[in-house]
Amino acid sequence: MEAFLRTHRYLVEHVNAPVRRNLMNEINWNDRLIGIKGTRGIGKTTFLLQYAKEKFDISDRQCLYINMNNFYFQGHGIADFAGEFYHHGGRTLLIDQVFKQPDWSSELRKCYDLYPNLKIVFTGSSVMRLKDENPELNGIVKSYNLRGFSFREFINLLTGNDFRPYTLEEILEDHEHIIKQILPKVSPNRYFQDYIHHGFYPFFQEHRNYSENLLKTMNMMTEVDILLIKQIELKYLTKIKKLFYQIAEEGSKKAPNVSKLAHDIETSRATVMNYIKYLTDARLLNLIYPIGEEFPKKPAKVMLHNSNLLYAIYPIQVEKQEAMETFFVNTLWKDHKVNTGYRDCNYIVDGKMKFRILDTHQMQRMKIQPDVIYARYNTEIGRGNQIPLWLLGFLY
């Protein structure tokens, strides 16, 4: 136990978290079992250590961070370790990469039943279905998703500002006033393209080639997260990677040709749809459906999950419009439902709001529809039903 406590103190003391993630405010920390899911490289470890640093003194033995990558846990279960920690006065156990432990869900259930005064916060892959696939945790675990940096968090990090998030309703009703609070302090256009290119994943702060780092992370998502958690044989990995690349290469302008994709990777249509779902769970893809439809039906659009992925896979041929629409869907995806639009709009949000994403210069030769919200790029200001696209990056 002493060795784990020493490691905990060292990690908490040296954690580098220059921006406080908004999820920290959204979690009800009074719950006894909290699961934090997120894609690889999104900052889950830093988030746990940041929580420990905020809530506990560094020498407080009531809180302990452990990582299931530690070889110690190849011969010791979570419940036994938690019991020893509890009997030594421990009350908050932070478990990183919980899925690396066999029978992790039943072990967590045992902890929950045996130690009513012990709080457990654990992290896992976005591919995990915490409640659907682990019935023993149903009703007792509170699940949250840690996302990549929003444009707001990115700007706060680079400029030292502390801009707050806004709801979609606030932005639509009061965007002209909100913009007046932001523009005197920062020029969003100076940072927006950088964010689109490399601002979503926290490791952009590291002094390494970002695209290479992201490609390695994407490979780990498919090789470890999807194969390990979904228990897929290694021989199918090349099919999943080839499918992902073909979808990325084709872009999102038309619905995927599932029959052609199945032929190209030599598998069935049903398997293609399953692979697409796994890639979506891994936060590599977003599926866009017409209103009233959902998986397992064929989506109307398959998009990359965030714009950074576009530049990592196909940097020379990224179309500006595709990058902007990818940003739009990704930033709204957290709290809103996005469906394909009609003739006069790109997307329907929450079943009622019509959005069109376009270059501000296109507005000069268009008839403005009063029931459409125009999210414009290449501008910092808005008026009426025309809002600057970058401001949607302040939703979280």
Predicted feature descriptions by range:
Residues 1-14, 27, 54, 277, ...:
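A cross-kingdom feature that marks ATP-driven nucleic-acid transaction machinery
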Residues 2, 8, 125, 131-240, ...:
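Interdomain motor-coupling "hinge/lid" segment immediately C-terminal to the ATP-binding subdomain
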Residues 36:
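Hydrophobic anchor at the beta1->P-loop junction of P-loop NTPases
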Residues 40-41:
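Walker A (P-loop) phosphate-binding loop of P-loop NTPases
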Residues 44-45:
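Conserved lysine of the Walker
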Residues 60-92:
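Short glycine-rich substrate-engagement loop in P-loop NTPases that contacts/grips substrate
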Residues 94, 119-125, 145:
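Structural recognition of the conserved hydrophobic beta-strand(s) that form the central parallel beta-sheet
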Residues 200-343:
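Accessory nucleic acid-recognition modules appended to NTPase machines
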